[in-house]
Amino acid sequence: WIMGHMVNAIAQIDEFVNLGANSIETDVSFDSSDNPEYTYHGIPCDCGRTCTKWEHFNEFLKGLRKATTPGDSKYHEKLVLVVFDLKTGSLYDNQASDAGKKLAKSLLQNYWNNGNNGGRAYIVLSIPNLAHYKLITGFKEALTSEGHPELMDKVGYDFSGNDDIGDVANAYKKAGVTGHVWQSDGITNCLLRGLDRVRKAVANRDSSNGYINKVYYWTVDKRQSTRDALDAGVDGIMTNYPDVIADVLNESAYKAKFRIASYDDNPWETFKN
């Protein structure tokens, strides 16, 4: 999965997919009443990027729905996964459950079209704080009470705080999650970060009793760091330059071993080669 980083304006969906992304990451900010409000990152952000592009969250979802609904004039067949980077730092821990419920209702109405031929992309809820695990249970409760528990088949999870892998496993246990787990690791492109924790995550993914299904690394903009991440065995790379990742995947060393994921590749299944 080539994951376009910080895609917060509707126009950027086309831009990143046209550069080679089959997945995008979108920032979601919340208001003081736990409602998802804007797709917005803010300053500071990655080096070389404009930090302030934004849409109202529900409007972005409508644009995203068009981009992922077969038959729509804006449809991109290869856009198959969306990571919502949930900026829950503005919320108290006890607001997490309500934020999850409101997020689910927004998605149900504006992205999934109330279960009637909505967008088809798989969705990852990426949460920065382990203490906010109730966002997951709230999200699930809302979809169930709205009569659409089947949509949880399209939803996966990530805790993005670079926490100890054992602590992450514990948070999932509390949230009742047993699958659909992506594990992120990384840092802003302005700084360097080694691959030690990525290797630990990959080892967990490949062990018989691990909780992780997929591992992705962020934010990778250079060819050499792309090669290093692929050599470590990641499933996804988040980038500001999808074309760079696509170029490296075309190199003879990687062409035989990796390919770009399509809609038929289940993002919740651990890849066994």
UniProtKB/Swiss-Prot annotation:
The active site is at 5, 41 (nucleophile). Disulfide bonds join 45-51, 47-190. GO terms for molecular function: lyase activity; metal ion binding; phosphoric diester hydrolase activity; toxin activity. Glycans are attached at residue 250. GO terms for biological process: killing of cells of another organism; lipid catabolic process. Keywords: Cytolysis, Dermonecrotic toxin, Disulfide bond, Glycoprotein, Hemolysis, Lipid degradation, Lipid metabolism, Lyase, Magnesium, Metal-binding, Secreted, Toxin. GO terms for cellular component: extracellular region. It is found in: Secreted. Expressed by the venom gland. It holds the Pfam family GDPD_2. It is an enzyme of class 4 (lyase). Mg(2+) binds at residues 25, 27, 85. Its cofactor is Mg(2+). It catalyses: an N-(acyl)-sphingosylphosphocholine = an N-(acyl)-sphingosyl-1,3-cyclic phosphate + choline; an N-(acyl)-sphingosylphosphoethanolamine = an N-(acyl)-sphingosyl-1,3-cyclic phosphate + ethanolamine; a 1-acyl-sn-glycero-3-phosphocholine = a 1-acyl-sn-glycero-2,3-cyclic phosphate + choline; a 1-acyl-sn-glycero-3-phosphoethanolamine = a 1-acyl-sn-glycero-2,3-cyclic phosphate + ethanolamine. Binds 1 Mg(2+) ion per subunit. Its EC number is 4.6.1.-. Belongs to the arthropod phospholipase D family. Class II subfamily. Dermonecrotic toxins cleave the phosphodiester linkage between the phosphate and headgroup of certain phospholipids (sphingolipid and lysolipid substrates), forming an alcohol (often choline) and a cyclic phosphate. This toxin acts on sphingomyelin (SM). It may also act on ceramide phosphoethanolamine (CPE), lysophosphatidylcholine (LPC) and lysophosphatidylethanolamine (LPE), but not on lysophosphatidylserine (LPS), and lysophosphatidylglycerol (LPG). It acts by transphosphatidylation, releasing exclusively cyclic phosphate products as second products. This is Dermonecrotic toxin LarSicTox-alphaIB1b.
